[in-house]
Regions:
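Extended non-globular C-terminal regions
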Residues: 461-462
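Residues that form ligand- and interface-recognition hot spots within folded domains
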Residues: 227, 236, 426-429, 437-440, ...
Length: 462
Protein backbone atom coordinates (compact mmCIF):
# COMPACT_ATOMS: atom_id res chain seq x y z
CA UNK A 1 0.00 0.00 0.00
CA UNK A 2 2.03 2.89 -1.33
CA UNK A 3 1.01 6.19 0.30
CA UNK A 4 3.08 9.14 -0.93
CA UNK A 5 4.40 11.88 1.39
CA UNK A 6 2.17 14.51 -0.19
CA UNK A 7 -0.89 12.31 0.42
CA UNK A 8 0.15 11.83 4.06
CA UNK A 9 0.36 15.60 4.60
CA UNK A 10 -3.07 15.97 3.00
CA UNK A 11 -4.59 13.31 5.28
CA UNK A 12 -3.11 15.01 8.34
CA UNK A 13 -4.32 18.46 7.23
CA UNK A 14 -7.84 17.04 6.90
CA UNK A 15 -7.94 15.99 10.57
CA UNK A 16 -10.47 18.17 12.39
CA UNK A 17 -12.60 17.61 15.47
CA UNK A 18 -15.99 16.15 14.53
CA UNK A 19 -19.02 17.04 16.64
CA UNK A 20 -20.15 14.29 19.02
CA UNK A 21 -23.52 13.76 17.34
CA UNK A 22 -21.90 13.71 13.87
CA UNK A 23 -20.25 10.35 14.50
CA UNK A 24 -20.88 7.88 11.65
CA UNK A 25 -21.93 10.72 9.36
CA UNK A 26 -20.45 10.99 5.85
CA UNK A 27 -18.05 13.64 7.16
CA UNK A 28 -16.97 11.35 10.02
CA UNK A 29 -16.28 8.47 7.61
CA UNK A 30 -13.92 10.70 5.64
CA UNK A 31 -12.19 11.52 8.92
CA UNK A 32 -12.03 7.79 9.72
CA UNK A 33 -10.44 7.02 6.33
CA UNK A 34 -7.78 9.67 6.95
CA UNK A 35 -6.98 8.19 10.38
CA UNK A 36 -6.59 4.67 8.96
CA UNK A 37 -4.33 5.79 6.11
CA UNK A 38 -2.19 7.97 8.41
CA UNK A 39 -1.64 4.96 10.65
CA UNK A 40 -0.61 2.80 7.68
CA UNK A 41 1.80 5.47 6.40
CA UNK A 42 3.48 5.93 9.79
CA UNK A 43 4.04 2.20 10.26
CA UNK A 44 5.37 1.91 6.71
CA UNK A 45 7.78 4.81 7.38
CA UNK A 46 8.59 4.13 11.03
CA UNK A 47 12.19 5.34 10.62
CA UNK A 48 10.85 8.89 11.07
CA UNK A 49 10.54 8.35 14.84
CA UNK A 50 14.35 8.47 15.09
CA UNK A 51 14.78 11.65 13.05
CA UNK A 52 14.84 14.88 15.06
CA UNK A 53 12.96 17.67 13.31
CA UNK A 54 11.26 15.49 10.68
CA UNK A 55 8.47 17.53 9.04
CA UNK A 56 6.15 14.53 8.95
CA UNK A 57 6.44 13.97 12.69
CA UNK A 58 6.04 17.69 13.34
CA UNK A 59 2.91 17.69 11.21
CA UNK A 60 1.25 14.81 13.07
CA UNK A 61 2.19 16.30 16.46
CA UNK A 62 0.27 19.47 15.58
CA UNK A 63 -2.82 17.25 15.37
CA UNK A 64 -2.05 15.31 18.57
CA UNK A 65 -4.88 16.97 20.51
CA UNK A 66 -7.37 16.36 17.68
CA UNK A 67 -6.49 12.65 17.63
CA UNK A 68 -6.49 12.45 21.43
CA UNK A 69 -9.98 13.95 21.64
CA UNK A 70 -11.20 11.50 19.01
CA UNK A 71 -9.61 8.55 20.85
CA UNK A 72 -11.23 9.47 24.17
CA UNK A 73 -14.61 10.19 22.54
CA UNK A 74 -14.58 6.82 20.76
CA UNK A 75 -13.69 5.11 24.05
CA UNK A 76 -16.69 6.61 25.87
CA UNK A 77 -18.98 5.81 22.94
CA UNK A 78 -17.72 2.21 23.10
CA UNK A 79 -18.33 2.09 26.84
CA UNK A 80 -21.83 3.58 26.53
CA UNK A 81 -22.72 1.32 23.62
CA UNK A 82 -21.46 -1.76 25.48
CA UNK A 83 -23.73 -0.98 28.45
CA UNK A 84 -26.67 -0.44 26.12
CA UNK A 85 -26.04 -3.73 24.28
CA UNK A 86 -26.09 -5.62 27.60
CA UNK A 87 -29.49 -4.10 28.43
CA UNK A 88 -30.83 -4.94 24.96
CA UNK A 89 -29.56 -8.52 25.12
CA UNK A 90 -31.28 -9.02 28.47
CA UNK A 91 -34.57 -7.84 26.95
CA UNK A 92 -34.13 -10.01 23.86
CA UNK A 93 -33.78 -13.12 25.95
CA UNK A 94 -37.42 -12.66 26.97
CA UNK A 95 -38.68 -12.54 23.37
CA UNK A 96 -39.60 -15.79 21.65
CA UNK A 97 -41.68 -14.67 18.69
CA UNK A 98 -40.10 -15.89 15.41
CA UNK A 99 -40.68 -12.57 13.63
CA UNK A 100 -39.09 -10.68 16.46
CA UNK A 101 -36.14 -13.04 16.39
CA UNK A 102 -35.69 -12.30 12.68
CA UNK A 103 -35.71 -8.56 13.38
CA UNK A 104 -33.22 -9.11 16.17
CA UNK A 105 -30.83 -10.87 13.78
CA UNK A 106 -31.05 -7.98 11.30
CA UNK A 107 -30.47 -5.46 14.08
CA UNK A 108 -27.51 -7.45 15.40
CA UNK A 109 -25.99 -7.53 11.91
CA UNK A 110 -26.36 -3.75 11.69
CA UNK A 111 -24.86 -3.27 15.15
CA UNK A 112 -21.89 -5.51 14.28
CA UNK A 113 -21.00 -3.26 11.34
CA UNK A 114 -20.76 0.01 13.24
CA UNK A 115 -19.28 -1.71 16.30
CA UNK A 116 -16.51 -3.05 14.09
CA UNK A 117 -15.92 0.33 12.43
CA UNK A 118 -15.86 2.13 15.79
CA UNK A 119 -13.36 -0.35 17.28
CA UNK A 120 -11.23 -0.17 14.12
CA UNK A 121 -11.24 3.63 14.42
CA UNK A 122 -10.11 3.55 18.04
CA UNK A 123 -7.44 0.95 17.26
CA UNK A 124 -6.04 3.01 14.35
CA UNK A 125 -5.58 6.09 16.56
CA UNK A 126 -4.12 4.00 19.37
CA UNK A 127 -1.68 2.34 16.92
CA UNK A 128 -0.58 5.79 15.79
CA UNK A 129 0.07 6.91 19.36
CA UNK A 130 1.84 3.65 20.20
CA UNK A 131 4.29 4.28 17.37
CA UNK A 132 5.04 7.98 17.86
CA UNK A 133 5.47 7.49 21.62
CA UNK A 134 8.56 5.41 20.80
CA UNK A 135 10.26 8.68 19.83
CA UNK A 136 12.18 10.27 22.72
CA UNK A 137 12.32 13.75 21.22
CA UNK A 138 8.54 14.34 20.96
CA UNK A 139 7.66 14.23 24.67
CA UNK A 140 8.39 17.89 25.32
CA UNK A 141 5.87 18.87 22.65
CA UNK A 142 3.06 16.64 23.96
CA UNK A 143 3.80 17.03 27.67
CA UNK A 144 0.51 18.76 28.46
CA UNK A 145 -1.52 15.95 26.85
CA UNK A 146 0.12 12.94 28.51
CA UNK A 147 -2.06 13.05 31.62
CA UNK A 148 -5.21 12.83 29.46
CA UNK A 149 -3.78 9.90 27.50
CA UNK A 150 -2.85 8.27 30.80
CA UNK A 151 -6.44 8.70 32.06
CA UNK A 152 -7.62 6.86 28.92
CA UNK A 153 -5.05 4.09 29.51
CA UNK A 154 -5.95 3.73 33.18
CA UNK A 155 -9.70 3.54 32.47
CA UNK A 156 -9.13 0.80 29.90
CA UNK A 157 -6.94 -1.21 32.27
CA UNK A 158 -9.63 -1.02 34.97
CA UNK A 159 -12.15 -2.35 32.42
CA UNK A 160 -9.72 -5.05 31.28
CA UNK A 161 -9.25 -6.24 34.85
CA UNK A 162 -13.02 -6.77 35.17
CA UNK A 163 -13.00 -9.26 32.29
CA UNK A 164 -11.77 -12.84 31.94
CA UNK A 165 -10.38 -15.02 29.17
CA UNK A 166 -13.78 -16.75 28.84
CA UNK A 167 -15.12 -13.59 27.17
CA UNK A 168 -12.42 -13.63 24.49
CA UNK A 169 -11.42 -17.22 23.93
CA UNK A 170 -12.17 -18.90 20.62
CA UNK A 171 -10.42 -22.10 19.60
CA UNK A 172 -8.18 -21.74 16.52
CA UNK A 173 -10.13 -22.41 13.31
CA UNK A 174 -7.92 -25.41 12.56
CA UNK A 175 -9.23 -27.07 15.72
CA UNK A 176 -12.94 -26.38 15.07
CA UNK A 177 -15.41 -28.46 13.06
CA UNK A 178 -16.94 -26.51 10.15
CA UNK A 179 -20.36 -26.38 11.87
CA UNK A 180 -18.91 -24.37 14.76
CA UNK A 181 -16.63 -21.93 12.92
CA UNK A 182 -19.25 -19.30 12.01
CA UNK A 183 -21.04 -19.65 15.31
CA UNK A 184 -17.84 -19.13 17.32
CA UNK A 185 -16.59 -16.21 15.23
CA UNK A 186 -19.90 -14.32 15.31
CA UNK A 187 -20.17 -14.88 19.01
CA UNK A 188 -16.78 -13.46 20.02
CA UNK A 189 -15.60 -11.10 17.25
CA UNK A 190 -16.59 -7.93 19.12
CA UNK A 191 -14.96 -9.16 22.33
CA UNK A 192 -11.75 -10.14 20.55
CA UNK A 193 -11.57 -6.64 19.05
CA UNK A 194 -11.84 -5.21 22.56
CA UNK A 195 -9.04 -7.54 23.68
CA UNK A 196 -6.84 -6.20 20.87
CA UNK A 197 -7.48 -2.66 22.10
CA UNK A 198 -6.60 -3.59 25.69
CA UNK A 199 -3.33 -5.17 24.52
CA UNK A 200 -2.47 -2.07 22.49
CA UNK A 201 -3.23 0.06 25.54
CA UNK A 202 -0.61 -1.94 27.47
CA UNK A 203 1.91 -1.51 24.63
CA UNK A 204 1.29 2.25 24.66
CA UNK A 205 1.72 2.36 28.44
CA UNK A 206 5.02 0.49 28.07
CA UNK A 207 6.31 3.13 25.64
CA UNK A 208 5.42 5.94 28.07
CA UNK A 209 6.81 4.24 31.19
CA UNK A 210 10.09 3.44 29.39
CA UNK A 211 10.46 7.22 28.98
CA UNK A 212 9.26 8.29 32.41
CA UNK A 213 12.49 10.29 32.82
CA UNK A 214 11.29 12.54 29.97
CA UNK A 215 8.02 13.47 31.71
CA UNK A 216 7.71 16.50 33.94
CA UNK A 217 7.37 16.09 37.71
CA UNK A 218 3.69 16.96 37.84
CA UNK A 219 2.79 14.26 35.33
CA UNK A 220 4.94 11.65 37.13
CA UNK A 221 3.26 12.61 40.43
CA UNK A 222 -0.14 11.99 38.85
CA UNK A 223 0.94 8.64 37.37
CA UNK A 224 2.17 7.56 40.81
CA UNK A 225 -1.01 8.93 42.41
CA UNK A 226 -3.14 6.74 40.11
CA UNK A 227 -1.27 3.82 41.75
CA UNK A 228 -1.42 1.76 38.59
CA UNK A 229 0.45 -1.08 40.32
CA UNK A 230 -2.86 -1.92 42.02
CA UNK A 231 -4.24 -2.66 38.53
CA UNK A 232 -1.20 -4.17 36.81
CA UNK A 233 -0.34 -6.77 39.45
CA UNK A 234 -3.89 -8.20 39.62
CA UNK A 235 -3.82 -8.29 35.79
CA UNK A 236 -0.65 -10.43 35.92
CA UNK A 237 -2.51 -12.76 38.29
CA UNK A 238 -5.74 -12.90 36.27
CA UNK A 239 -4.16 -13.22 32.79
CA UNK A 240 -7.19 -12.53 30.54
CA UNK A 241 -4.90 -13.22 27.53
CA UNK A 242 -4.38 -16.84 28.65
CA UNK A 243 -6.95 -19.64 28.53
CA UNK A 244 -5.91 -23.14 29.58
CA UNK A 245 -3.09 -24.09 27.15
CA UNK A 246 -3.72 -21.15 24.81
CA UNK A 247 -2.40 -17.59 24.72
CA UNK A 248 -3.50 -14.60 22.64
CA UNK A 249 -0.51 -13.82 20.41
CA UNK A 250 -0.31 -11.67 17.27
CA UNK A 251 -4.09 -11.12 17.25
CA UNK A 252 -5.10 -14.79 17.51
CA UNK A 253 -5.39 -17.60 20.03
CA UNK A 254 -2.56 -20.11 19.65
CA UNK A 255 -1.59 -23.30 21.45
CA UNK A 256 1.19 -22.53 23.93
CA UNK A 257 3.33 -25.65 23.50
CA UNK A 258 6.44 -24.50 25.39
CA UNK A 259 4.59 -22.57 28.13
CA UNK A 260 6.16 -19.28 26.99
CA UNK A 261 4.89 -15.95 28.27
CA UNK A 262 2.54 -14.07 25.97
CA UNK A 263 4.07 -10.86 24.57
CA UNK A 264 1.51 -8.76 26.45
CA UNK A 265 2.56 -10.39 29.72
CA UNK A 266 6.22 -9.63 28.99
CA UNK A 267 5.23 -6.01 28.39
CA UNK A 268 3.49 -5.91 31.77
CA UNK A 269 6.51 -7.38 33.56
CA UNK A 270 8.81 -4.76 32.03
CA UNK A 271 6.38 -1.98 33.02
CA UNK A 272 6.32 -3.35 36.58
CA UNK A 273 10.12 -3.57 36.61
CA UNK A 274 10.40 0.14 35.74
CA UNK A 275 7.63 1.37 38.06
CA UNK A 276 8.99 -0.57 41.05
CA UNK A 277 12.75 -0.13 40.56
CA UNK A 278 13.09 3.20 38.75
CA UNK A 279 14.61 5.78 41.11
CA UNK A 280 12.20 8.54 40.00
CA UNK A 281 9.19 6.33 40.83
CA UNK A 282 10.66 5.07 44.11
CA UNK A 283 11.17 8.62 45.34
CA UNK A 284 7.52 9.48 44.71
CA UNK A 285 5.86 6.17 45.64
CA UNK A 286 5.07 6.21 49.34
CA UNK A 287 5.15 2.62 50.56
CA UNK A 288 2.28 1.47 52.78
CA UNK A 289 1.43 -1.98 54.13
CA UNK A 290 -1.27 -2.34 51.49
CA UNK A 291 1.08 -1.40 48.65
CA UNK A 292 3.82 -3.65 50.04
CA UNK A 293 1.46 -6.63 50.19
CA UNK A 294 0.36 -5.94 46.62
CA UNK A 295 3.97 -6.01 45.33
CA UNK A 296 4.69 -9.17 47.33
CA UNK A 297 2.03 -10.98 45.27
CA UNK A 298 4.65 -11.09 42.51
CA UNK A 299 6.97 -13.21 44.66
CA UNK A 300 5.31 -16.49 43.68
CA UNK A 301 6.06 -15.87 39.98
CA UNK A 302 9.81 -15.45 40.47
CA UNK A 303 11.53 -18.52 39.03
CA UNK A 304 14.08 -19.65 36.43
CA UNK A 305 11.39 -19.94 33.75
CA UNK A 306 10.68 -16.21 34.10
CA UNK A 307 14.39 -15.27 34.23
CA UNK A 308 15.10 -17.18 31.02
CA UNK A 309 12.55 -15.11 29.13
CA UNK A 310 13.10 -11.82 30.98
CA UNK A 311 16.56 -11.76 32.62
CA UNK A 312 16.06 -8.37 34.39
CA UNK A 313 13.35 -9.96 36.55
CA UNK A 314 16.13 -11.44 38.68
CA UNK A 315 16.88 -7.90 39.88
CA UNK A 316 13.19 -7.37 40.60
CA UNK A 317 13.16 -10.63 42.57
CA UNK A 318 16.05 -9.38 44.73
CA UNK A 319 14.10 -6.20 45.52
CA UNK A 320 10.95 -8.19 46.36
CA UNK A 321 12.91 -10.49 48.69
CA UNK A 322 14.36 -7.46 50.48
CA UNK A 323 10.86 -6.05 50.79
CA UNK A 324 9.62 -9.39 52.14
CA UNK A 325 12.24 -9.66 54.92
CA UNK A 326 12.25 -5.94 55.65
CA UNK A 327 11.52 -5.04 59.25
CA UNK A 328 10.47 -1.53 58.31
CA UNK A 329 7.06 -0.59 59.61
CA UNK A 330 4.99 0.94 56.85
CA UNK A 331 1.89 3.06 57.51
CA UNK A 332 -1.53 1.56 56.76
CA UNK A 333 -2.45 4.51 54.54
CA UNK A 334 -0.40 7.04 52.62
CA UNK A 335 0.06 10.48 54.13
CA UNK A 336 -2.00 13.36 52.85
CA UNK A 337 0.31 16.07 51.58
CA UNK A 338 -0.67 19.30 49.92
CA UNK A 339 0.44 18.84 46.32
CA UNK A 340 -0.31 20.61 43.07
CA UNK A 341 -2.59 18.22 41.23
CA UNK A 342 -3.10 17.94 37.49
CA UNK A 343 -6.59 17.22 36.23
CA UNK A 344 -7.07 15.39 32.90
CA UNK A 345 -9.20 18.25 31.58
CA UNK A 346 -9.77 16.91 28.07
CA UNK A 347 -10.72 13.46 29.38
CA UNK A 348 -13.14 14.90 31.96
CA UNK A 349 -14.62 17.40 29.50
CA UNK A 350 -15.45 14.67 26.95
CA UNK A 351 -16.79 12.36 29.66
CA UNK A 352 -19.12 15.06 31.03
CA UNK A 353 -20.23 16.04 27.53
CA UNK A 354 -21.20 12.45 26.66
CA UNK A 355 -23.01 11.89 29.96
CA UNK A 356 -24.85 15.19 29.54
CA UNK A 357 -25.98 14.17 26.02
CA UNK A 358 -26.43 10.47 26.79
CA UNK A 359 -29.98 10.24 25.39
CA UNK A 360 -29.06 11.96 22.14
CA UNK A 361 -25.92 9.81 21.77
CA UNK A 362 -27.89 6.58 22.29
CA UNK A 363 -30.53 7.78 19.85
CA UNK A 364 -27.78 8.52 17.32
CA UNK A 365 -26.28 5.04 17.80
CA UNK A 366 -29.69 3.40 17.36
CA UNK A 367 -30.40 5.27 14.14
CA UNK A 368 -27.15 4.98 12.23
CA UNK A 369 -27.54 4.60 8.49
CA UNK A 370 -24.52 3.89 6.32
CA UNK A 371 -24.97 4.30 2.57
CA UNK A 372 -23.73 1.55 0.25
CA UNK A 373 -21.28 3.99 -1.36
CA UNK A 374 -19.70 4.90 2.00
CA UNK A 375 -19.62 1.28 3.15
CA UNK A 376 -18.07 0.21 -0.16
CA UNK A 377 -15.42 2.93 0.06
CA UNK A 378 -14.49 1.97 3.64
CA UNK A 379 -14.43 -1.73 2.72
CA UNK A 380 -11.92 -1.01 -0.05
CA UNK A 381 -9.64 0.76 2.44
CA UNK A 382 -9.91 -2.11 4.92
CA UNK A 383 -9.15 -4.64 2.18
CA UNK A 384 -6.07 -2.67 1.07
CA UNK A 385 -4.82 -2.48 4.67
CA UNK A 386 -5.44 -6.21 5.17
CA UNK A 387 -3.51 -7.10 1.99
CA UNK A 388 -0.69 -4.76 3.03
CA UNK A 389 -0.47 -6.35 6.50
CA UNK A 390 -0.57 -9.83 4.98
CA UNK A 391 2.28 -8.90 2.63
CA UNK A 392 4.40 -7.59 5.53
CA UNK A 393 3.78 -10.75 7.58
CA UNK A 394 4.86 -12.92 4.65
CA UNK A 395 7.98 -10.80 4.20
CA UNK A 396 8.85 -11.05 7.90
CA UNK A 397 8.30 -14.81 7.87
CA UNK A 398 10.59 -15.18 4.85
CA UNK A 399 13.28 -13.03 6.50
CA UNK A 400 13.03 -15.10 9.66
CA UNK A 401 13.38 -18.34 7.68
CA UNK A 402 16.39 -16.96 5.78
CA UNK A 403 18.02 -15.88 9.05
CA UNK A 404 17.42 -19.34 10.46
CA UNK A 405 18.99 -20.99 7.39
CA UNK A 406 22.01 -18.66 7.59
CA UNK A 407 22.41 -19.36 11.30
CA UNK A 408 22.35 -23.13 10.71
CA UNK A 409 24.86 -22.71 7.87
CA UNK A 410 27.20 -20.70 10.11
CA UNK A 411 26.96 -23.31 12.83
CA UNK A 412 27.85 -26.09 10.39
CA UNK A 413 30.83 -24.11 9.10
CA UNK A 414 32.13 -23.80 12.63
CA UNK A 415 32.43 -27.58 12.71
CA UNK A 416 32.65 -29.43 15.97
CA UNK A 417 34.14 -26.55 17.99
CA UNK A 418 30.84 -24.59 18.27
CA UNK A 419 32.59 -21.59 19.82
CA UNK A 420 30.48 -18.49 20.41
CA UNK A 421 31.28 -15.10 21.88
CA UNK A 422 29.27 -13.39 24.61
CA UNK A 423 26.96 -10.65 23.30
CA UNK A 424 27.96 -8.48 26.25
CA UNK A 425 31.65 -8.97 27.16
CA UNK A 426 32.84 -10.82 24.01
CA UNK A 427 34.36 -13.67 26.03
CA UNK A 428 33.68 -17.32 25.16
CA UNK A 429 29.99 -18.14 25.64
CA UNK A 430 28.10 -21.33 26.36
CA UNK A 431 24.62 -20.04 27.23
CA UNK A 432 22.08 -19.37 24.49
CA UNK A 433 19.11 -16.97 24.64
CA UNK A 434 16.20 -19.36 25.11
CA UNK A 435 13.78 -17.08 23.28
CA UNK A 436 15.40 -16.14 19.95
CA UNK A 437 18.24 -18.73 19.89
CA UNK A 438 20.40 -16.07 18.21
CA UNK A 439 22.42 -14.55 21.08
CA UNK A 440 24.99 -16.20 23.35
CA UNK A 441 26.32 -15.30 26.80
CA UNK A 442 29.07 -16.41 29.13
CA UNK A 443 26.87 -15.99 32.22
CA UNK A 444 23.40 -15.03 33.44
CA UNK A 445 24.87 -11.72 34.67
CA UNK A 446 26.00 -10.78 31.15
CA UNK A 447 22.60 -11.77 29.76
CA UNK A 448 20.87 -9.46 32.25
CA UNK A 449 23.22 -6.57 31.44
CA UNK A 450 22.64 -6.99 27.70
CA UNK A 451 18.87 -7.48 27.89
CA UNK A 452 17.75 -3.90 27.29
CA UNK A 453 19.94 -3.73 24.16
CA UNK A 454 18.95 -7.19 22.98
CA UNK A 455 15.19 -7.17 23.67
CA UNK A 456 14.12 -5.42 20.43
CA UNK A 457 16.03 -7.94 18.30
CA UNK A 458 14.79 -10.78 20.48
CA UNK A 459 11.13 -9.79 20.20
CA UNK A 460 11.28 -9.89 16.39
CA UNK A 461 11.81 -13.66 16.56
CA UNK A 462 8.71 -14.30 18.69
Amino acid sequence: MDIKDIEFFEYVNNLKNVELLDMFSTKWFEYHKNVVLINVYLHNNNELIDVVGDDRMGHILKKFEVLLRELITTYFIRFLNFEEQIKKNNKKMLKTDELKNKNIEEENSHNHIYDYISLYHEMAILNTFELILLSDHIYEQIDSYIINLFAYIYSNLVSFLKTSSDEYFVKPITELPISEILKEENDKTHNIDRLKIYINVINTLRNIIDRIHLLNNTVVNKIVDYDILLILIPLIEKKPWKHDDYIFEQNEWIKNEDNALATVEKQLWIILYTLILNRICQEKYEMTNYRRNNILKLRKYMNEHLYEQLPPMKTLHTYIEHLYISKSVFPENKNSYLIIDVVPEIFDEIKNDILKNKKQVLSMLNNITISREVLGSISEVYLSVYEFDHQIKKSKKKTKENNSVNTNKDEKEKGGDNQYTCNNCKEMAELQCSQCKQAYYCSKECQMKDWFSHREVCSSYT
